[in-house]
Amino acid sequence: MSASSAARRPVEAMLGLSIREVSQALRDGKVSATELCRKCINQIQRTRYLNAYITIAEETAMEQAERADKRLRTGKTLGPLDGIPFSVKDNFCTENIKTTCASNMLKGYVPPFSATVVQKLLDQGAVLVGKTNLDEFAMGAGSTDGAFGPVRNPWSYAAPYREQSAEDPDSDWTITGGSSGGSAAAVASLSSFLALGSDTGGSTRNPGSLCGVVALKPSYGLLSRHGLIPLVNSMDVPGIMTRSVHDAATVLRILQGRDERDSTTVQAPNTPPSLPEHFDMRKICVGIPKEYHAPGLSEDTLAQWSRVADIFENAGARVKEVSLPHTPYSIVCYHVLCCCEVASNMARFDGLEYGHRSAVDSSTDAMYATTRHEGFNNVVRRRILSGNYFLLKSNYERYFVKAQQMRRLIAEDFKKVFSSGIDVLLTPTTLSDAARYADFITEDNRTRSAQEDVFTQPVNMAGLPAVTVPTALSQRGLPIGLQLIGQTLQDWKLLTIAHWMEKQLHFPMIRFHRDLNENEREQNRSIRERTHTVGS
C-alpha cells in the first residue's frame, strides 16, 4: 500500500500502517498527531483485556501530540517519528512517569530522568502513550510472572485462532512470550506503532516471534543502556519492536551511537538513510546451524525454516549448513551467568534509597530481609539465591569461571562461521508457536525460560545483532517467526537481508475475530483490577 492511498483511508485504518506510511499521512495533513494519539489511546482501552500496559500516559501523550501538530503545521518537523505514538517496556526509566519493572519492589516509583533511548525518541517528536507489562524485573519468557498479571497474545483473539476454538476466549488464550510481552502485544494489537523492549537472552525476539511483529536485538554497545534497569549488564540490550523491518531500521538509526553515560557504547557505523528496496541475493551466503534442530522443534516451525531457506536459495543465495558445536551447552552457561549478575544487580534494592520498604523495624537486618521478601516474587528470589550460590568462594571456579570460559567458546563458534564466508545465519526464534497460558504455567519459570530461550540466548552471549521476522501462521492460526543473526556491528546489513526476506513472505495483518462485548470487557476489567488498575 502506498503512503498516498493509505492517507486517504479513515483514521481507524491508519493504526495498522507502517511508520513510514503514517508519517507521510501526518506531513500531508491527512491526519493530525492528536487524532492519531487519541486513536491509539482508544485502542489501548478497547484491548485492555490483553493487559499489555501497566501505565497509560494519556495526559502527557496528548500534550506531546499537540506540540507535534504545531510543528507539522509549520513544516518544522523533528524527523520521521514526529507525532508517532510509541510505548516503552516498564523497565526503562521515564521522567515523571512510573517505572515499576512489574514488581512490588518498585510499585509507584517515579524516576527523575528518562533512559537515553526513550529521550532520543522524545527528542524526535515521538509520542509516549504508555509503559508496557513484563515479567518481574524482566525475568521470564512468557510475560506471566509480573506483579500486574499475565499479558495475553492478541492473536488469541484474531480470526485464524478463534475460528478453530470452541472455548471461551477468556479461558482459551495464549502467552505473548517474554519478557517484553507487553511491548509485543502493544505493537501487534495496533495500539502503538513501535515499542521498546529489552533483550538479555531473547526477551525482545521471543515475544516478537510469538506475536507476529519484527523484533530487533542490536549489537551489544550500539544502543545505550543508560536508564534501563539492569538485569545482566554484560548481555542487556534495548530492543526495537515494529510491524516492519523498514520501521525497525528507521528507529535504529535514531537510537544508535555513543552515550557518555554508558561506557559500553560504541560509535555507530555510517548507514544510508534507508534500506534498499532491491537487493541482489546472489552475493549472500546464508548459514543453517545444524545444532538448532533442537528437541521439541515443532513441525510447523521446521516447515517454515525449510521454506524460507528454499526462498533464499531460489533467489540465488548460497545456503550452507554450518556447525556451532558449543550451542548445546549455551542455555546452562547462560543460566549461571544470568543468575550471578542478577544477584549483584538486585542487591541495590534494599528499601533505603527508593522503592518498597517494609514496616518491620526491629532491626536493620530484619527490615532489609523483609523488604526483599515482600518486594520480590519467587522467581526473582530464586535467581538471587542461585547467583549467590554460584558465586560462593567454594563454587566460583566450578560454576562462574567455567561458564565464562564456555561463553568465550560460544562466541568463537560464531566468529569461525562468519569468517568462513557466511553473511547471516537463519534459525528458528522459538521451538513452536505460542503456548496456551493454561499449559504454559504447568512448568516452573526456570524450565519455561530454558525452553523458550534455547535459540536466542547464544546471540546475547556473543554480543551479535539478531532480528526475528514473522513468516506465516501455524496450523493453529498463530504467528511463527524466524531469526536472522548477523555479525557484530553489521546491523544494517542484517536488516537489509531481513527486509528482502520480509517482502517475500507477505505475513498477514492481524484481524480480530470480534470486539469483546461490554459485559466481557467489564469482566476483564474486574479481573485486571483484582491485580492492579492500569496506572496504579
Curated annotation (Swiss-Prot):
Enzyme class, broadest EC rank: ligase
GO CC, any one term: glutamyl-tRNA(Gln) amidotransferase complex
Role of this protein: Allows the formation of correctly charged Gln-tRNA(Gln) through the transamidation of misacylated Glu-tRNA(Gln) in the mitochondria. The reaction takes place in the presence of glutamine and ATP through an activated gamma-phospho-Glu-tRNA(Gln).
GO MF terms, alphabetically ordered: ATP binding; glutaminyl-tRNA synthase (glutamine-hydrolyzing) activity
Active site per the UniProt annotation: K89, S179, S203
Positions of disulphide bridges: none
Reactions the enzyme catalyzes: L-glutamyl-tRNA(Gln) + L-glutamine + ATP + H2O = L-glutaminyl-tRNA(Gln) + L-glutamate + ADP + phosphate + H(+)
The protein's name: Glutamyl-tRNA(Gln) amidotransferase subunit A, mitochondrial
Location in or out of the cell: Mitochondrion
Record flagged with keyword Iron-sulfur: no
Record's keyword terms, sorted: ATP-binding, Ligase, Mitochondrion, Nucleotide-binding, Protein biosynthesis
Family to which this protein belongs: Belongs to the amidase family. GatA subfamily.
Assigned EC number: 6.3.5.7
